[in-house]
Amino acid sequence: MAETQTLNFGPEWLRALAGGVGSSIVASPPLSPALPKYKLADYRYGREEMLALYVKDNMIPVDLHDKEFLPILQEEPLPPLALVPFTEEEQRNFSMSVNSAAVLRLTGRGGGTVAGAPRGRSSSRGRGRGRGDGFYQRSFDDVEGGFGRGGREMHRSQSWEERGDRRFEKPGRKDPDGAPAHFPLNHIRANYEDPAAVNARKFIHAECDNWRTTRDELNGEEDDNGWRLAGARRENERWCPPSPDGPRSAGWREHPDQRRRFGFGDEERSGYRRPRSGSGSAEEERDSLPEWCLEDAEEETGTFDSSGAFLSLKVRALEKAPKEPILEEAELDFRPLEENDEYAEKDDSETEQTKDTDTNTRHESDRNEENCKSEEPSPVAVPFSAVVTPPKATTPAPIQPVHLEKAEDKERPSERTTLPEIRHELSKAPLHTALSNSIVEAISIPHVANKLPDLPVPAPSVLPVKSVPPQSQQVKPIEMPVSVPPALLRSTGSVGPISRPSALPSDLDEDEGLKHFEQEAEKMVAYLQDGGVDDERLASKIGPKPSALPITNEAAFKWFYKDPQGEIQGPFNNQEMSEWFQAGYFTMTLQVKRGCDEMFQPLGEMIKLWGRVPFTPGPTLPPILGDADQERMKRQQEINALNMYQLQQMQYQYLLRQQYALQQKVLNSAPPPPPPPQQQLNLLLHQALKIRTPEPQQSLLPPVTRSMSVPDSGSVWEMQNPSTQASCSPNMQPAAPSTWEGSSVWDLPLDNMPQASSIEQLQLEKAKALKLEMERREAELRAKREEEERKRLEEALRARQEEERKRLEEEELARRKQEEALKRQREQEEAQRRKKEEEERLAQEEALRRLEERRREEEERRQREEFLRKQQEEERRKQEELEAQRRREEEKRLEEEAAAAAAALLRQQQEEQKKREQEAQRQQELQRQRQQQQEALRRLQQQQQQQQLAQMKLPSSSKWGQQSTTANSLSQSQNALSLAEIQKLEEERERQTREEQRRQQQELQRVQQQQPQTKLPGWGSVAKQPMATKSLLEIQREEAQQMKQRKDQQQQQQQQQQPPPQPQPQQHSTNTQQNRTQNRAAINTSVWGSVNNVSSNWMMDSSVWGDTQNSNIGFWDEAVKEAAPPQTTRKSHTPKNKGNANLSNSSSGKASKKVEEEEKLLKLFQGANKNQDGFMQWCEQTLHTLNTANNLDVPTFASFLKEVDSPYEVHDYVRAYLGDTPQAKDFAKQFLERRAKQNDNQQKPQQGQQQKQQESVWGIREVPQSVLLQQQQQQQLQQQQQQRFETVTSGKKKKKQKMVRADPSLLGFSVNASSERLNMGEIETVEDF
């Protein structure tokens, strides 16, 4: 039982995975380790499911685009092996029996491995087929089915077991109810051109291919015991596949009448012959099966269907309904074909009666054959004979089958591949039938006989009529050459045989025989209709005649084809047809046409006509119009010839039966009947000619069809007259009834004719024979003429087709040349376009490069210009520094020269002082006169000051202007003090200055200790340094001290200048110059001091605001300390005053303007000090209530608004910051009124305080009229402005006055120029020097 392991179910890898668990009911280990058992997979998929999962257009996954996968990545996916045609080696592998190959390989006997390893399938009997270990590369000769060698196609979707019953069957007719089959690619006809394909097959099989017998011998079992004997010798048909008429079966378990007939070795080799019997019961079938496949086994067994599901055999045995075929398998039913398996199915339409009758005959012939005869495949015997039993024979002679099929099989491929002339020759070849009293000896084809040297039956030629003595009991065979059309030879089992009645009564009814012959004629004509569709198809469906579609129809240029069942399929586009053609589904004989064509043509003819595969892209041909009349005429000729042949045969058979009946009557001593009336023959002829086929449909055959006419050589009538022999044996008994075993319509049994003894009978027969001979000759002449006419028409048609083909080839050549020219032109245009694009791209790159270079050059140029500009700026700055240094040196030199001049003047003054002391007395005398002059001068100065004040328009709150004017007026009216008093005052002033400096230093140190981290950055940080803010009272007190000091100096000067009397104009000019000098000194000692205040110790100078050089008093202090007499002082001052006169005159206007601006700034500064009086408190409270938007710094805005003089500007600022509301307008009006009152209240105490100060220093002095006048004018001016504002407020838009400059400390830098830099600040002229 170990050998049966080769029939395990499932693929090999599944059995190996299973490890023996549940994969087989046999517990014994397998014979070879090469067939291990595996565990079954949890999920199994059928072929259709796996193919459905394959999508050709799927994109490559993104993960596989990595660089590491590039060497092994293939752009185009490999198609599934089910869609790839087999190579020749794979076809040879598939044509072998897997059981035989596996057993022979395991036992080491013969059957070496084939050259090509199995591809994409398991070597053992596994259903599933994987791709195998390696990767598959198509060889260069693995092409699709073409004209020459076309490999036999098999359906890749089926493994050996799935194919099971249909492994070797011919692609026969399908079940009409099932899905229409696709294309059986039986390219085996083309394989006959390749002798290697034929010879290679016989070396594959071992000496004995009956593997069951081989195993029996190995196991030492007897030939006559066990199921193996039954399987090998007895009921071999049990193992045959079922009939293709039914659906696919599962194997042995089907009932015998559901099984397909299949001779496993009948047509393949003589060593393994299988009878064609379908008899036998279920019990016998069980006896002939191995025990491991019986249903009473221990475990449940079954098979796997195409979806991978397990099917129990018990369940399947209970189901009597046949399983429906899988749709795709039904549509794509490709099966392997042996060289001689064209006729594996012969008696598809036989009745059960015929099947049963030839069973015994087949069994006897099988027993006479040896099992393993030779390696070569022997010719296959098919019963083609008419068995005739002699009259007195007790047992029938042994049947010698006629070996015809091999020759016919070889004849057919040549018909398919050669020109129509060869077909005509084949159809003309006579078939000689030797008729004897026991058997039809042989049927052969003479011109094919040389190909079959091993035929056991000779091919006799036509023999002349021999006379045999009447005493001879041995009847010589009657040789009758019969010409059988190839279609009849090819379909011997297609037409049901005529079964004669078992007993032939002596009074045979002639009408019955005539009716019988008419039925046979009808069958023959019906076969001709069917055979015209396909020589191998007997019951094909003939579709309607195709008609051409108009060009405008969308399906006009789509493709239609006729499937093997004769049905028209379509329309399909070019892409679908091309894919099917490349997949190998189409044979060269497939009938195809476009929608616009009128007729179908074979694909091979279409390819020749088009010059290419018509489905591929290219120019299309005009619609092909069918030559329907010619086809119809040819077909009619064939039918006429066949009808004539039928008529002759029917007449001959009828005459034979008449003679036989006549002889029986003569033997029964009956009077001879009259000859058959001419009316009966005419009626028979009329009825035979009335059987006409309708106009034949257009068939799937090529346009040139085979001839069905009667051949030239060999005549039906060239036969021995039966009456000659009948007359020699008058003593013979009537013939026993015999069964007719022939497979042709005309192989009717001819019973032995009793010999007539009467001379009249012989004469009558001779006359009839002469008449028949004449009719026969006329029929032959007519047939010859028709044959010649047909040949001529065929020749003309062939010539026309050749011309058409040449024309199409020339057109195709011209079209190809035109296409090549167009292709070259397109390539040139493409090259020019690419060249132009390349030039454009280069030009763009060049332009970009130039643009980049230009941009880079521009950047470099800009950098160079920037560098040059910086260099020029640096050089200019250096030049300015050099110029400033030169000017400083020049100033220093001038100062030194001035010091030298001052020293010289001092010496001169000392000398002159002595002279003045001498003249002092004289001056006292003149003092009274000089006082008068001074009084006039004071009045003149008052007028000048009033004019200046009118120009300056000082506000009422400016204290310094009043004080300076007061000081000037006082200095002129004071009496000269003594020198000791002046020195005391000077010492007192110096002491106060030192105390003030010491106090300022202490404050500065304290501030620096509080802010030790404060840096001294540039000029922008000056405003951020802490200011030693003083109250208004302190500032006024210090200013009063300065004014007192100036008055002291002026008194000293007056005392020095009083003794020498001078003319009045000179004194006037001197005093004017002194006053201007003093004014300029006062300007220098203004509130803000000089620019040197930027330094951190700006409060360490001698004055209140820190003039660094103390230029206002340095010169006069020295003069005072010299204590020179008055005369020298006046003399020494005269040149100096002259030198400074122009300078004072030119700068007086500027000084007054600067004093005015500085006073305004000081007002703003005082407001920043937040002198919180009642007016300011009211102002801030009101602003807080009005500041609803919370966007105003109230203290700063109040102090700023307080210093704005113009009522217009006050209203503008209030409107801008507080909004144009009634509350804001009311606030502005109240603000102006309160400010005016406060200014009046502030001016009165200040005037009183000034009077007190003047009284404390100089005694009680009256306030100068100019000061009072100025104050009055200012008050009047403010009142006028207020009134003017009130009157104009209701008018139109106000004109803004000039805005007051802000405190420079708020800006963070000083607006005054440095005193060390020239050309900055005031404009100086040459006259200033």
Curated annotation (Swiss-Prot):
Which parts of this chain are annotated as the region Disordered? Answer: 109-184, 236-419, 720-740, 781-1081, 1122-1155, 1236-1256, 1279-1302
Where do Acidic residues bias regions lie?
293-302, 339-351
Bias (Basic and acidic residues) ranges: 150-177, 251-271, 316-338, 352-376, 403-415, 781-896, 909-928, 983-1001, 1035-1049
PROSITE patterns the UniProt entry points to: GYF (PS50829)
Q: What happens when the gene is disrupted?
A: Morpholino knockdown show mild, intermediate, and severe phenotypes. Embryos with severe phenotype display a disrupted body pattern, embryos with intermediate phenotype show defects in the head and eye structures, while embryos with mild phenotype only show a twist in the terminal part of the tail. Embryos do not show important cell loss in diencephalic dopaminergic (DA) neuron clusters.
Which GO biological-process labels does this protein carry? insulin-like growth factor receptor signaling pathway
What cellular-component terms does GO give this entry?
Answer: cytosol; membrane; perikaryon; proximal dendrite; vesicle
- Can you give the residue ranges of the GYF domain? 556-604
Q: Which segments show compositional bias classed as Low complexity?
A: 377-397, 899-908, 929-951, 967-980, 1002-1013, 1239-1254
Specify residue ranges for compositional bias: Polar residues. 720-732, 954-966, 1068-1081
To which protein family does this belong? Belongs to the GIGYF family.
| Function description | Key component of the 4EHP-GYF2 complex, a multiprotein complex that acts as a repressor of translation initiation. In association with EIF4E2, assists ribosome-associated quality control (RQC) by sequestering the mRNA cap, blocking ribosome initiation and decreasing the translational load on problematic messages.
Q: How does it assemble?
A: Component of the 4EHP-GYF2 complex.
Report the protein name in the record.
GRB10-interacting GYF protein 2
Organism annotation: Danio rerio
Q: Which gene encodes it?
A: gigyf2
